[in-house]
């Protein structure tokens, strides 16, 4: 039983498969209001959305790999995983009433932890309480504050948020990623987009945001056997990569005549970029979001990071690819979170949930993540609303 000084939290002390390394601590130290900085908030976590990128890090690195106290003082490494969540505000920092009056105690919010707290201090979201910066939080406003009804027809409860806490838990980092990468592509109506990994949680959000930019045509998706699901969120065409191997040869054969105006890879398949010249238009951008193909070891992760850094720098005369390349990681902020929520409120964006697991079953949730067969977000219910 947790108290105000302790809480339930999943922790890990070594690298490896999360389903094998995490341990449930029923008396983990709880953050408190006394620890809050001026722009921070204490949140009671209801749901946590798992992230494949964090799973890759957990498999490759021990917790807090860059924490100097642990290096020099040889303190025990201990980390709480994950960073995307939804919940209820318990307490606010001293600056919040004047800078963010929309964030008050008892307000329902979605957001993510600061990178420093997660990756350096080991204080992630898979716990009953967490501290998060105001810049990476946004309230779930009731429908009555964001929409109006012009007719007498029955509609949604105006006192209800436009999205549930459960669905909202996966919208902060992934939603910001979808909006920000579409901004990077500079796509306009009539352009042609290719998304690899359309059945990933971020892939399905990208498809929906792209639909608002490109209109009825233009989004081509590579996925497995999930064509119905992918089309339901707005894809115009779905390529079954399991039946078209190698995928880059299929793209060269069928799309060289009208190349793509942007390619977004949610998986991290290097060959898609190294062979993309015929099917990605000159001057257009290849964006990689994924690390699912990285070897799950320290050196494998180091090699992946090195390759991401070198890909755009390698000269064409030495075998480089004459197309722009960028590895992108979400930068959640208030402005982008606001854009995400406006899309949700207009019914133009929804989170596809693969499965929901109770807090005690987080190991099973990680097994689902490790299978790489999830179709949408994997959610852990930390505590009841």
Swiss-Prot record:
Keywords: NADP, Nucleotide-binding, Oxidoreductase. One of its GO terms (cellular component) is mitochondrion. NADP(+) binds at residues 64-67, 199-202, 223-226, 241, 289-290, 372-373. It comes from the Eukaryota. Transmembrane segments: none annotated. Induction: Expression is positively regulated by the oxaleimides biosynthesis cluster-specific transcription factor poxB. Pathway: Secondary metabolite biosynthesis. Substrate binds at residues 156-163, 309-313. It is an enzyme of class 1 (oxidoreductase). GO terms for molecular function: nucleotide binding; oxidoreductase activity. Trans-enoyl reductase; part of the gene cluster that mediates the biosynthesis of oxaleimides, cytotoxic compounds containing an unusual disubstituted succinimide moiety. The first step of the pathway is provided by the HR-PKS poxF that serves in a new mode of collaborative biosynthesis with the PKS-NRPS poxE, by providing the olefin containing amino acid substrate via the synthesis of an ACP-bound dec-4-enoate. PANTHER family: ALCOHOL DEHYDROGENASE RELATED (PTHR11695), RETICULON-4-INTERACTING PROTEIN 1, MITOCHONDRIAL (PTHR11695:SF294). Monomer. Belongs to the zinc-containing alcohol dehydrogenase family. This is Trans-enoyl reductase poxH. It comes from Penicillium oxalicum (strain 114-2 / CGMCC 5302).
């Amino acid at each position: 039983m947790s108290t105000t000084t302790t809480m339930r939290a999943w922790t890990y002390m070594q690298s490896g498969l999360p389903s094998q390394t995490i341990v449930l601590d029923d008396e983990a130290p709880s953050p408190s209001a006394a620890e809050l900085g001026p722009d921070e908030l204490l949140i009671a976590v209801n749901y946590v959305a798992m992230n494949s990128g964090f799973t890759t890090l957990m498999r490759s690195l021990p917790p807090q790999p860059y924490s100097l106290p642990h290096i020099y003082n040889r303190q025990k490494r201990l980390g709480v995983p994950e960073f995307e969540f939804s919940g209820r505000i318990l307490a606010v920092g001293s600056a919040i009433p004047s800078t963010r009056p929309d964030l008050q105690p008892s307000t329902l919010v979605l957001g993510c932890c600061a990178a420093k707290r997660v990756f350096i201090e080991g204080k992630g979201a898979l716990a009953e309480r967490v501290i998060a910066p105001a810049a990476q939080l946004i309230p779930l406003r009731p429908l009555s504050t964001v929409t109006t009804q012009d007719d007498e027809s029955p509609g949604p409860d105006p006192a209800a948020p436009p999205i549930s806490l459960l669905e909202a838990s996966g919208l902060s980092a992934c939603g910001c990623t979808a909006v920000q990468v579409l901004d990077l592509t500079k796509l306009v109506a009539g352009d042609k987009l290719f998304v690899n990994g359309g059945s990933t949680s971020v892939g399905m959000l990208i498809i929906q945001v792209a639909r608002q930019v490109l209109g009825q045509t233009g989004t081509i998706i590579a996925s497995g056997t999930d064509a119905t699901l992918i089309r339901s969120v707005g894809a115009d065409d779905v390529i079954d990569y399991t039946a078209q191997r190698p995928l880059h040869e299929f793209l060269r054969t069928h799309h060289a005549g009208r190349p793509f105006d942007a390619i977004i890879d949610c998986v991290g398949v290097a060959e898609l970029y190294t062979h993309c010249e015929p099917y990605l238009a000159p001057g257009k951008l290849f964006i990689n979001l994924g690390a699912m193909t990285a070897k799950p070891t320290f050196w494998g992760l180091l090699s992946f990071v090195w390759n991401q850094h070198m890909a755009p720098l390698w000269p064409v005369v030495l075998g480089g690819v004459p197309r722009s390349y960028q590895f992108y990681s979400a930068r959640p902020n208030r402005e982008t979170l606001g854009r995400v929520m406006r899309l949700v409120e207009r019914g133009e964006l929804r989170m596809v949930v693969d499965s929901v697991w109770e807090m005690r079953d987080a190991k099973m949730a990680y097994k689902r993540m490790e299978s790489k067969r999830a179709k949408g977000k994997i959610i852990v219910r930390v505590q009841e609303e």
